[in-house]
Every structure is written in C-alpha cells, then in structure tokens.
Amino acid sequence: REAAERSKMIDRNLREDGEKASKEVKLLLLGAGESGKSTIVKQMKIIHEDGYSEEECRQYKVVVYSNTIQSIIAIIRAMGRLRIDFGDVARADDARQLFVLASSAEEGVMSPELAGVIQRLWEDSGVQACFSRSREYQLNDSASYYLSDIERIAQGSYIPTQQDVLRTRVKTTGIVETHFTFKDLYFKMFDVGGQRSERKKWIHCFEGVTAIIFCVALSDYDLLLAEDEEMNRMHESMKLFDSICNNKWFIDTSIILFLNKKDLFEEKISRSPLTICYPEYSGSNTYEEAAAYIQCQFEDLNRRKDTKEIYTHFTCATDTKNVQFVFDAVTDVIIKSNLMECGLY
C-alpha cells in the first residue's frame, strides 16, 4: 500500500511539474548591439512589476550624468573631425572648459558650471549642425533627450524619472535574467549582450526556449557599425537574424521580430534615403513603404517559410504604452502555440 501511495505521489509531482513547465515561458532577447534589448527588459519591470523605486531611480543618476556628458563630448570631438565651426567663437572656451570639468567631476554630481557649459554648447548652431550629422560618428540615441533637458537634470534635487531610466545606456555584458508573471504565465526573460564577441558564449545554452524576441534598430540603416566599421549595421543585423532564424537549435522556437526605434526611423527617413542601406530599393522614402521593405528583407531570410512563421511588430522600446500593447499580442501568440503543442487548440 505504501508503494502505491508513493507511486501516486510521484505521478502527482510529475503532473505538477509538467503543468508548471507548460506555464513557464522562456524568452530569449537577441539582436545586434544597441538594438533596444535592455530597454525592453526595463519595460517589463515597469509594466509587469512595480517599476523602479525612488531608491533605484536615484542609483541611475550616475548613468544619466555620464550618458549626458559623454554625448556632448562625442559631438564636440566630431566637430573637429568633420571640420564644423562653432556658431559663436566664445564656445571654443566652453569646449575646453567642458573637458576640464568633465574629467574632474565627481560621479553623480553635476556642478552648475558644468551644466552651464553643456547648455551653452548644446544651444550653439555649430553644435546643432554637428548633431544633425550624427550618422557619421557614434552617438547615443538619448543624446538630445538628456541634453535638451539639462536644466531639469542638473538640479541639486534631481531624481531620475522612469522615462529617464528607460533612456539610460549601459552596455550589456553577460546574460541578464528577469522574471515576471503575466496572463497566468511565468516568464523568464534572458537579455544577451549584442556585441559579437559575446555570441558564441550563449548560442547553445538555450534549447527549449519558448520564443525568441529579435530586436532590430530600424534607425541603424544609415549608420556604420561600431565594432569593425566595415559592414552597415542593418546588414550586420540581417546576418545575425539569418543565423538565428535558421539555426538548428531553434527549429521549433517561435521567432518574434521587433523592428524597433520606429520613432527615430520615421524622423530620419525623410532626410536619409533607404538606398544608403539597400541600393536596389526603388520605393519612396515614406515611413510606411520603407519600413515595409525592411520587414520583407528580414522575413525573406526565413528558409522554412512553409513551417515557420515570423511574427513581426514595429516598436518603440522607450514608449511604455507601445511595448505593453505589443507584448500583450506576443503573449497571445505564445499561449496559442503552447496550446497547439498540448493538442488543446
């Protein structure tokens, strides 16, 4: 009788484990460097957990300041390389001052002098001209977000808002894991560093992943790649997508494509033609047509079109409402494919 009881218990445990496994969703976030993966992770914390506490926000102050200072420095350095002059010659003194103050600044402190220097530089017409040519050098996406708001963030009492935190940029190294529950599912999301050297470390770790969310920065189409400057970033991203989408490890994994930074793309497409990236493109440089073309370029890489569907969404990872809406749709796809596997659909 004890044996029978024990065997019943084992059965029950196995069944519970099975149910738990069917409710556990492993999501892998992939994509080239700076495509928005970590921003999506931050949004999950804001949408599905309680967001960032005041204490956590305070800790981001250091990053906000360093992102802001690094951005203005990058623009000033590029002015030299691109031979752009200041609109007002007095700004040259401010630029020298910037380097001195930035190198001696205490972490997480923005002195009124430094804030004043940054504000005067940012408002200079030469600096703005250089900023508008940022595709020719490396500049943080959030540069104008912080620099235009320097007065607010330089105040002594400043505490970063959720949006300020979303905009911070810190290179992801290693694997960042986040857990949350949504629609009765237990999500485990893995954010993997996008820079190339990181890739070989993780590709085999993720058998049994429910879905891959692959992020692409639409606005990268006119940029050069940071790591080796040889290949356009969009082509680099397509190459990575090709290797993931057609990878033997991921034959049964749902692939969800986030064509991200749609806001920056929409802003750029009117002044930087898509032919920079796709010389054969003959459509118009409107957001709809150009975005649809990029979507086809990625979806056409799928070599198993008859058996594998790619679920594409246009996203703006810094926009909480948009991410919430898209993630809701993604979850429905996951629930549906889970039910199909269990034969319940």
From Swiss-Prot:
GO CC aspect terms: centrosome; cytoplasm; heterotrimeric G-protein complex; midbody; plasma membrane
BP terms from Gene Ontology: adenylate cyclase-inhibiting G protein-coupled receptor signaling pathway; adenylate cyclase-modulating G protein-coupled receptor signaling pathway; cell division; G protein-coupled dopamine receptor signaling pathway; GTP metabolic process
Keyword Signal listed: no
UniProt GO molecular function: G protein-coupled receptor binding; G-protein beta/gamma-subunit complex binding; GDP binding; GTP binding; GTPase activity; metal ion binding
InterPro entries linked: Gprotein_alpha_I, Gprotein_alpha_su, GproteinA_insert, P-loop_NTPase
Pfam families attached to this UniProt entry: G-alpha (PF00503)
Keyword presence, Repeat: no
G-alpha domain span: 23-345
Main location (coarse class): cytoplasm
Chain sites annotated for binding Mg(2+): S38, T172
SMART domains recorded: G_alpha
Role according to the record: Heterotrimeric guanine nucleotide-binding proteins (G proteins) function as transducers downstream of G protein-coupled receptors (GPCRs) in numerous signaling cascades. The alpha chain contains the guanine nucleotide binding site and alternates between an active, GTP-bound state and an inactive, GDP-bound state. Signaling by an activated GPCR promotes GDP release and GTP binding. The alpha subunit has a low GTPase activity that converts bound GTP to GDP, thereby terminating the signal. Both GDP release and GTP hydrolysis are modulated by numerous regulatory proteins.
PANTHER family: GTP-BINDING PROTEIN ALPHA SUBUNIT (PTHR10218), GUANINE NUCLEOTIDE-BINDING PROTEIN G(I) SUBUNIT ALPHA-3 (PTHR10218:SF230)
Annotated family: Belongs to the G-alpha family. G(i/o/t/z) subfamily.
Listed name of the protein: Guanine nucleotide-binding protein G(i) subunit alpha-3
Organism per entry: Xenopus laevis (African clawed frog)
